[in-house]
């Protein structure tokens, strides 16, 4: 099979960050993750795109429109698309205080705006914004009914 039509194959960039740092393996730069993704091939099948975490050190969620355009061009030059985006939600858990929940919703909103800009630039023809409650199972289990309502 020389071409994969469905499902779209994407490589996530956040494994280049998560679990890495001064006390572990070095962070893999965003540019390196792009190059590795573009170069990867198995039996003639290549990745269609990347999924990105909207958090440092790879992506600044508050980057300018020009910065977003540069990001889109960088990905497009490698014949890749951007699919799912991971919202940076750990600043305020969905089951936290009123202020925490407001921050959580704001991060999701900003991620959606970022994703729309990528779509408008033609680099994100499909995709989702991934979120997590940023809350532990143990805290959720203390009051599953009401905590599920808070998360949902």
Task: Outline where the language-model segments fall.
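N-terminal pre-domain/capping segments
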Residues: 1-125, 139-142, 149-150
């Amino acid at each position: 099979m020389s071409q994969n039509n469905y499902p779209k194959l994407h490589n996530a960039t956040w494994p280049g960050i998560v679990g890495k740092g001064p006390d572990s393996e070095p962070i893999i730069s965003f540019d390196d993750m792009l190059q590795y993704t573009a170069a990867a091939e198995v039996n003639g099948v290549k990745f269609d795109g990347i999924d990105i975490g909207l958090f440092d050190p790879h992506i600044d969620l508050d980057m300018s429109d020009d910065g977003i355009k540069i990001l889109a061009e960088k990905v497009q030059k490698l014949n890749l698309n951007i699919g799912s985006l991971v919202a940076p939600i750990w600043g305020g858990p969905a089951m936290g205080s009123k202020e925490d929940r407001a921050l959580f919703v704001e991060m999701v909103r900003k991620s959606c705006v970022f994703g729309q800009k990528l779509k408008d630039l033609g680099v994100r023809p499909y995709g989702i914004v991934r979120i997590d409650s940023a809350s532990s199972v143990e805290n959720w289990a203390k009051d599953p009914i009401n905590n599920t309502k808070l998360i949902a």
